A protein has these predicted regions:
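Switch/connector loops and helix/strand junctions flanking conserved nucleotide-binding motifs
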Residues: 16, 32-33, 119-120, 146-151, ...
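Signal for well-folded cores of large energy- and translation-related assemblies
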Residues: 24-28, 39, 43, 60, ...
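Residue-level signature of catalytic and energy-coupling elements of molecular machines
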Residues: 13, 19, 38, 66, ...
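Conserved catalytic-core segments of large NTP-driven translation/proteostasis enzymes
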Residues: 155, 162-237
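C-terminal effector modules of nucleic-acid-centric enzymes and ribosome-associated factors
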Residues: 5-8, 146-149, 153, 163-166
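Conserved Switch II/interswitch segment of TRAFAC-class P-loop GTPases
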Residues: 81-83, 88-94, 102-126, 130-155
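Alpha-helical scaffold elements adjacent to nucleotide-binding pockets in ATP/GTP-utilizing enzyme cores
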Residues: 19-23, 37, 97, 121-128, ...
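P-loop NTPase switch module centered on the Walker A-proximal segment
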Residues: 2-93, 105
Length: 237
């Protein structure tokens, strides 16, 4: 069975953890006790829906603050492919963690909030993927439910992204653009009737179609995020 690692990127509150939680839920990767825990926590917070972001926030601080700080690696599978998803933080101060999570990825999903469009953190994460040489980029315009699933909103964002790619993108990279709503499972596992103007595939189908390249050239590589050294004359910095 094929194995592919995909990193997530995007600004804070763009919905990365919710998207991954949705993928886990819809592919049957969550156990019954995990679902029960999410149901209880969602109800306790007064939500009328499942807060699937809880499926990925592992640290106590993350659970308390409702944010992602460290990189979480999540596993799920379909009949023909296994996935490792790196859930990376969106806050600017945790960009280093995002770089670490993306450093071994074969593809990246860059999420955007449909209400905000392309912002500074979107561009920053895009540049990181180009620097790391990631060959497959999916721009996922999330929260389309909050803009009434309007095609013109998606097209405006896509045009801005295309301009960014044309100016700064690597030529040997494949770029994809997809509108979705992770919260309501629109265009995640199956094509959405509310987004029927979009003729492309659902997100999971797109993820399953990404070519898996051999990583033999990287065998033996050990990624290091930060080196702590003694403060001496030999190592003064």
């Amino acid at each position: 069975m094929e194995l592919i690692k995909i990193a997530t990127a995007g600004s804070v509150d763009d919905g990365k953890s919710t998207l991954i939680g949705r993928l886990l839920y819809e592919t049957g990767a969550l156990k019954s006790d995990q679902i029960q825990h999410i149901e209880e926590k969602s109800a306790a917070r007064g939500f009328g829906y499942l807060d699937l972001s809880l499926a990925t926030d592992g640290l106590l601080t993350e659970r308390e603050q409702g944010i992602t700080i460290d990189v979480s690696h999540i596993f799920f599978s379909t009949p023909k492919r296994r996935f490792i998803i790196a859930d990376s933080p969106g806050h600017v101060e945790y960009t280093r963690n995002m770089v670490t999570g993306s450093s071994t990825a074969q593809a990246s999903i860059i999420l955007l909030d449909a209400r905000k469009g392309v912002i500074e953190q979107t561009k920053r994460h895009f540049f990181v993927t180009q620097l790391l040489g990631i060959k497959h980029i999916i721009f996922a315009i999330n929260k389309m439910d909050l803009v009434n699933y309007k095609q013109e909103v998606f097209e405006d964002i896509k045009t801005t992204l295309n301009n960014l790619v044309d100016k700064h993108g690597n030529k040997d990279v494949s770029y994809h653009y997809i509108p979705l709503s992770a919260l309501y499972n629109e265009n995640i596992v199956n094509r959405s009737e509310k987004l029927d103007w979009h003729k492309g595939e659902a997100l999971l189908d797109l993820m399953k179609a990404i070519p898996v390249e051999s990583n033999k050239a990287n065998d033996g590589v050990f990624q290091i995020q930060y080196v702590i050294r003694p403060k001496t004359e030999a190592f003064h910095d």
